[in-house]
């Protein structure tokens, strides 16, 4: 069996992921506020309530590939207690999960499996890429390793590290919760492509750049 990979073009017309065309637009709630103050406030409160329930009840899909999954599993222990964020309910079926954590090295033969499992997840769904191997292939710049899972599925949060610590995984959960809290999804019962507004989140590298540049006294290797 032959496997092929296709790079994602967010603005492409014939791309499978994402199903809708992505473009930077204004928050649709602003239009409702100017149109009707009462209905705008009511819809804003309804969106906040729905997003609050979604972001505080994230069920991860139990899917690990290599050593990064060990660090992810460590976050479920009593020391870290990821249950504080409502993400302790591991699901063995993609149809019952809210987000997938691709933790570890993604090989070429594994890519179609991950893509199929992603298709089986129900909306709304999110993806976290955990570790250098999942982000960009890591040290494995070879023919059998995919150079980043974002080549065939959309990724919402990237976790750097080889492997990242459990604290990094919990920080990714907080960033994902913050992003979900700013989303605007259709509230009707109609199933279909109705458009999803996602906030343009600033990366942690850009957010902390000024603080890191301002540091004058660097720690010695013994103090790190």
Swiss-Prot record:
EC number: 7.1.1.-
Top EC class for this record: translocase
Catalytic activity: a quinone + NADH + 5 H(+)(in) = a quinol + NAD(+) + 4 H(+)(out)
Molecular-function annotations in GO: 4 iron, 4 sulfur cluster binding; iron ion binding; NADH dehydrogenase (ubiquinone) activity; NADH:ubiquinone reductase (non-electrogenic) activity; quinone binding
Keyword entries, A-Z: 4Fe-4S, Cell inner membrane, Cell membrane, Iron, Iron-sulfur, Membrane, Metal-binding, NAD, Quinone, Translocase, Transport, Ubiquinone
PROSITE patterns hit by this protein: COMPLEX1_20K
Keyword Flavoprotein attached: no
Localization terms from the record: Cell inner membrane
Coiled-coil parts of chain: none
Quaternary structure and partners: NDH-1 is composed of 13 different subunits. Subunits NuoB, CD, E, F, and G constitute the peripheral sector of the complex.
Job of this protein: NDH-1 shuttles electrons from NADH, via FMN and iron-sulfur (Fe-S) centers, to quinones in the respiratory chain. The immediate electron acceptor for the enzyme in this species is believed to be ubiquinone. Couples the redox reaction to proton translocation (for every two electrons transferred, four hydrogen ions are translocated across the cytoplasmic membrane), and thus conserves the redox energy in a proton gradient.
Family as reported in the entry's similarity comment: Belongs to the complex I 20 kDa subunit family.
Protein name listed in UniProt: NADH-quinone oxidoreductase subunit B
Organism of this sequence: Photorhabdus laumondii subsp. laumondii (strain DSM 15139 / CIP 105565 / TT01)
Organism lineage string: Bacteria, Pseudomonadati, Pseudomonadota, Gammaproteobacteria, Enterobacterales
Name of the gene this protein is made from: nuoB
């Amino acid at each position: 069996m032959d496997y092929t990979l296709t790079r994602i073009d967010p603005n492409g017309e014939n791309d499978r992921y994402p199903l809708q065309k992505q473009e930077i637009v204004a928050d649709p709630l602003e239009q409702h506020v100017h149109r009707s103050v009462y209905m705008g406030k009511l819809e804003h409160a309804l969106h906040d309530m729905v997003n609050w329930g979604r972001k505080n009840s994230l069920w991860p899909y139990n899917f690990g590939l290599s050593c990064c999954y060990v660090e992810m599993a460590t976050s479920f222990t009593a020391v870290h207690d990821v249950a504080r964020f409502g993400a302790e309910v591991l699901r063995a079926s993609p149809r019952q999960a809210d987000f997938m954590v691709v933790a570890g090295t993604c090989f070429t033969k594994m890519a179609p499996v991950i893509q199929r499992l992603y298709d089986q997840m129900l909306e709304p769904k999110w993806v976290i890429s955990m570790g250098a191997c999942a982000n960009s292939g890591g040290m494995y710049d070879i023919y059998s390793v995919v150079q980043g899972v974002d080549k065939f599925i959309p990724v919402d949060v990237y976790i750097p590290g080889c492997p990242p610590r459990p604290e990094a995984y919990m920080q990714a959960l907080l960033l994902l919760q913050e992003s979900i809290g700013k989303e605007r999804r259709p509230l009707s019962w109609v199933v279909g492509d109705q458009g999803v507004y996602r906030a343009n989140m600033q990366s942690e590298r850009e957010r902390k750049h000024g603080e890191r540049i301002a540091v004058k006294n660097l720690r010695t290797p013994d103090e790190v």
